[in-house]
């Protein structure tokens, strides 16, 4: 009697975008049993003006109908609120600029949602439309940059461990974005023209401040130069980030005959003061390193690679060579020094370390080390 091999079942996290939609099609083409899962992390009843989940869900339904695959839905809005959004607010109140998408990947998407797929939907693997690669050795699974370096999203995935990576598939690992859109058009997916999502996973960047004001009260404070010259008033330090230019409302202010734009360089959260400097290349905007406390390793201890390692402190930023130094056993601080000073090192953001295209792990920036004191 011929033994029939059962198809591997893969649950694809469907966002309503072109990437996750084509990911599902690619897996179908490879012969897997594919089912879609729409994950809702935000209740639009709380904020109709900001959340697009209704539109996204309708797009997912259309795609699943076209592909003829089952669609599951799950609401993780309570888990998201407790584990991601409250942390997001807490960090803003500390004067930091957090990245909730990274925390969402760690706690919601590749933890709670992954476990739900494996346990309750009986899947063998969990797939998403991220641009990243997973490579396997005899002992471990490793995270690498995607073939499309412009779209690479490994920066947002550095918190994942080898055990988690063993259950994940990234179908777009070796594809360029242009190719994905061409495929979507060719197979007549309704989302082939849909714009890529930007900003936080539940809100568009243009509406960010008005959204944040619902949860953090405005507190009028001073905008000062580094020499303590008064330039104007701001709405509260929580609404500004290091390197910010827009929204300061001091564009017409000129110091001497210098008409360069102003940038946020420092925040005093106790006195509610925003400090600004003029000019994109102002040395006050530069840092030669940062302090962090805990580094997450995907597999290998980063200190083994400290002379070869590069660090990326923002999404799509050019990585820079760095070195590591343990400077205090008491508070466990680690100092990371760049080969050359760089702009806008922002507390609360993630610093992700690479060995060539291999993602080693990362950490949260606790404090920048300014080029000028």
From Swiss-Prot:
- What is a single molecular function from GO for this protein? ATP binding
Q: Which cysteines are joined by disulfide bonds?
A: 104-201
**Top-rank taxon, per record:** Bacteria
Q: Which Gene3D superfamilies match?
A: Adenine nucleotide alpha hydrolases-like domains, HUPs, Translation factors
Active-site residue numbers: 104 (nucleophile), 201 (cysteine persulfide intermediate)
The positions annotated for binding ATP are 13-20, 39, 129
Enumerate the residues marked as the site Interaction with tRNA.
130, 349
Q: What is its main location?
A: cytoplasm
| Entry EC number(s) | 2.8.1.13
Q: Which reaction does it catalyse?
A: S-sulfanyl-L-cysteinyl-[protein] + uridine(34) in tRNA + AH2 + ATP = 2-thiouridine(34) in tRNA + L-cysteinyl-[protein] + A + AMP + diphosphate + H(+)
Question: Which one GO biological process term can you cite for this protein?
Answer: tRNA wobble position uridine thiolation
Provide this UniProt record's keywords sorted from A to Z: ATP-binding, Cytoplasm, Disulfide bond, Nucleotide-binding, RNA-binding, Transferase, tRNA processing, tRNA-binding
The record's region (Interaction with tRNA) falls at 151-153, 314-315
Q: Which GO terms describe its cellular component?
A: cytoplasm
Q: What class of enzyme is it?
A: transferase
Its quaternary organisation is: Interacts with TusE.
Q: Describe the task this protein carries out.
A: Catalyzes the 2-thiolation of uridine at the wobble position (U34) of tRNA(Lys), tRNA(Glu) and tRNA(Gln), leading to the formation of s(2)U34, the first step of tRNA-mnm(5)s(2)U34 synthesis. Sulfur is provided by IscS, via a sulfur-relay system. Binds ATP and its substrate tRNAs.
Q: Which family does it belong to?
A: Belongs to the MnmA/TRMU family.
| The protein's name | tRNA-specific 2-thiouridylase MnmA
């Amino acid at each position: 009697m011929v033994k029939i091999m059962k198809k591997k079942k893969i649950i694809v996290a469907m966002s309503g975008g072109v990437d996750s939609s084509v990911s599902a099609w690619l897996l179908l083409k490879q012969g897997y049993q594919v089912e879609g899962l729409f994950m809702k992390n935000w209740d639009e009843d709380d904020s109709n003006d900001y959340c697009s989940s209704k539109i996204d869900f309708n797009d997912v339904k259309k795609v699943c109908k076209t592909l003829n695959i089952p669609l599951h839905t799950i609401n993780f809005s309570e888990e998201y609120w407790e584990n991601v959004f409250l942390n997001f607010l807490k960090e803003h109140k500390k004067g930091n600029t957090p990245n909730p998408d990274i925390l969402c990947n760690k706690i919601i998407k590749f933890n709670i949602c992954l476990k739900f797929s494996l346990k309750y939907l009986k899947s063998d693997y969990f797939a998403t439309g991220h641009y990243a690669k997973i490579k396997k050795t005899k002992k471990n699974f490793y995270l690498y940059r995607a073939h499309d370096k412009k779209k690479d999203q490994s920066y947002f995935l550095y918190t994942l461990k080898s055990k988690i990576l063993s259950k994940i598939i990234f179908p777009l690992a070796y594809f360029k974005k242009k190719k994905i859109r061409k495929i979507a058009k060719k197979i007549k997916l309704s989302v082939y023209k849909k714009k890529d999502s930007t900003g936080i996973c539940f809100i568009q960047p243009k509406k960010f401040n008005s959204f944040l004001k619902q949860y953090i009260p405005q507190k009028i404070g001073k905008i000062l130069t580094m020499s303590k010259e008064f330039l104007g008033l701001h709405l509260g330090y929580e609404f500004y980030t290091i390197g910010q230019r827009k929204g300061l409302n001091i564009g017409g202010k000129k110091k001497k005959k210098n008409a360069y734009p102003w940038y946020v360089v420092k925040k005093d959260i106790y006195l509610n003061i925003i400090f600004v400097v003029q000019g994109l290349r102002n040395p006050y905007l530069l840092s030669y390193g940062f302090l962090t406390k805990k580094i997450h390793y995907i597999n290998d201890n980063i200190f083994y690679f400290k002379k070869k390692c590069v660090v990326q402190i923002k999404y799509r930023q050019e990585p820079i060579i760095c070195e590591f130094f343990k400077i205090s056993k008491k508070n466990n601080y680690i100092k990371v020094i760049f080969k050359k000073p760089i702009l806008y090192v922002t507390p609360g953001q993630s610093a992700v370390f690479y060995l060539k295209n291999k993602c080693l792990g990362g950490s949260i920036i606790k404090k920048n080390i300014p080029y000028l004191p």
